[in-house]
A protein has these predicted regions:
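ACP-dependent fatty acid/polyketide chain-elongation machinery
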Residues: 1-67, 246-258, 351-365, 411-415
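Conserved catalytic cysteine-centered active-site region
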Residues: 1-3, 37-80, 111-174, 183, ...
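Condensing-enzyme catalytic core mediating Claisen C-C bond formation in acyl metabolism
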Residues: 5-9, 36, 215-290, 299, ...
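Conserved small-residue
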Residues: 10, 28, 82, 104, ...
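Acyl-CoA/ACP chain-elongation machinery
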Residues: 39, 183-229, 262-274, 304-311, ...
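Active-site-proximal alpha-helical scaffold in enzymes
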Residues: 78-91, 141-144, 149-152, 157-193, ...
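Phosphate/pyrophosphate-binding loops at sites that engage ATP/ADP/AMP, CoA/4′-phosphopantetheine
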Residues: 85-98, 248-255, 283-299, 321-325
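Glycine-/small-residue-rich "gating" segment that lines the acyl/pantetheine channel
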Residues: 125-132, 170-173, 177, 194-250, ...
Length: 415
């Protein structure tokens, strides 16, 4: 039996560069950073005091205040992005939609860390009897999917993946396969994160993973630049509506792009330090799944976190996977503007990769002041200015702690 084709019919996102897709995309193309000093809590005793915070976000646009108070902020972001994507797709207006065939898979790398932190403080101050009865369901990672299914009445597969910073990519790739293999006709898929808290920022700072460029937040995230000194933590959510092609055509849905490949791998090397073989294997497997060659790739939305080791390693991995063609590909890191959204990043960067294909534009990688050629970072990173380009095939890379890797392949749709 031939596999069914899967297309993207809806996009939604909440991020440091905007609380809807169009605002975020416009800001990315303009090279506007969403990174600033932390306002969410007093970070004065942490050496990294900067973050890509979501600003001016109103969950009341999506659910009631009573409901919102019962859940952590990462669930807020996930619900908002999901409802945006569903609205964009026109699913609510579809006639005779079989909701038994619509599922949701929106994951998170960390989950309800702010709620866990606040509840821990409550217990220390007043004992276990003061724990909010909504603490557990308000912190669980699969509850983004759970809330969306309840809000929309979807009775297809519902779960939430957890694989550190590869979560969003894994959620999307896994969901596409559910459709290909006939387990669903539509999947709402992506990732969400809201870990800008004392524990979240302090934990990564203790690992010496974060940038300490507190005097100039907007230039702190600088992938492949010689002066990069760590990543900048971010937050938000990115969600796609994935749909079986004939199902989408039948209801006259607009189609942004087709998802044609998904590859996964493990480094089998180190909990936090990367190696090039694992990521290269994910790219190679994704292209094989898509039935494409390295020479077919036009654009890479790279993991590109702005860490000294990670950026050089990903460049090596791309050279290993794409060979000489790696020098002809646009390699872009939107994290230079959003920061690193952890488990949400595969979702938001999938949104941006789909838009790169649909709009035939690459956002810039900002803050490349002196490209780190000495470390081998010598590819075309679309430095500092957006670019019109022929982008028929885009890949999106996500790598996470534990050596988990995921690559998605998106292709310009043609009947």
């Amino acid at each position: 039996m031939s596999q069914r084709r899967v297309v993207i019919t809806g996009l939604g996102q909440v991020s440091p560069v905007g609380n809807d897709v169009q605002t975020a995309w416009n800001n990315l193309l303009s090279g506007r950073s969403g990174i600033g000093l932390i306002t969410r809590f007093d970070a004065s005793d942490i050496n990294s005091q900067i973050a890509g915070e979501v600003r001016d976000f109103d969950i009341g646009q999506y659910i009631s205040g009573k409901e919102a108070r019962r859940m952590d902020v990462f669930i807020h972001y996930g619900i908002a992005a999901a409802l945006q994507a569903i609205s964009d797709s026109g699913l609510d207006d579809a006639e005779n939609l079989d909701k038994d065939r619509v599922g949701v898979n929106i994951g998170s790398g960390i989950g309800g860390l702010p709620s866990i932190e606040a509840t821990g403080k409550t217990v220390l101050e007043g004992g276990a009897r003061r724990i909010n009865p909504f603490f557990i369901p308000g912190s669980l990672i699969n509850l983004i999917s759970g809330h969306v299914t309840i809000l929309k009445g979807y009775r297809g597969p519902s779960y939430g993946m957890v694989s550190a910073c590869t979560t969003g990519a894994h959620s999307i790739g896994d969901s596409a396969r559910l459709i290909k293999y006939g387990d669903a006709d539509v999947m709402i898929a992506g990732g969400a994160e809201g870990a800008i808290s004392t524990l979240g920022v302090g934990g990564f700072a203790a690992m010496k993973a974060l940038s300490t460029r507190n005097d100039d937040p907007a230039t702190a995230s600088r992938p492949w630049d010689k002066g990069r000194d760590g990543f900048v933590i971010g937050e938000g959510a990115g969600v796609l509506v994935l749909e079986e092609l004939e199902h989408a055509k039948k209801r006259g849905a607009k189609i942004y792009a087709e998802i044609v490949g998904f590859g996964m791998s493990s480094d089998a090397y180190h909990i936090t330090a990367p190696n090039e073989e694992g990521p290269a294997l994910a790219v190679t497997r994704a292209l094989k799944d898509a039935g494409l060659n390295p020479e077919d790739v036009d654009y890479v939305n790279a993991h590109g976190t702005s860490t000294p080791l990670g950026d050089a390693n990903e460049t090596k991995a791309l050279k290993l996977a794409l060979g000489d063609h790696s020098r002809k590909v646009i390699v872009n890191s939107t994290k230079s503007m959003t920061g690193h959204l952890l488990g949400a990043v595969g979702g938001v960067e999938a949104v941006y990769s789909v838009l790169a294909v649909h709009e035939q534009k690459s956002p810039p990688t900002i803050n490349i002041f002196e490209q780190d050629i000495e470390a081998g970072c010598d590819l075309d990173y679309c430095a500092n200015e957006a670019r019109d380009a022929k982008i028929d095939v885009a890949i999106s890379n996500s790598f996470g702690f534990g050596g988990t890797n995921g690559t998605l392949v998106f292709k310009k749709f043609s009947g």
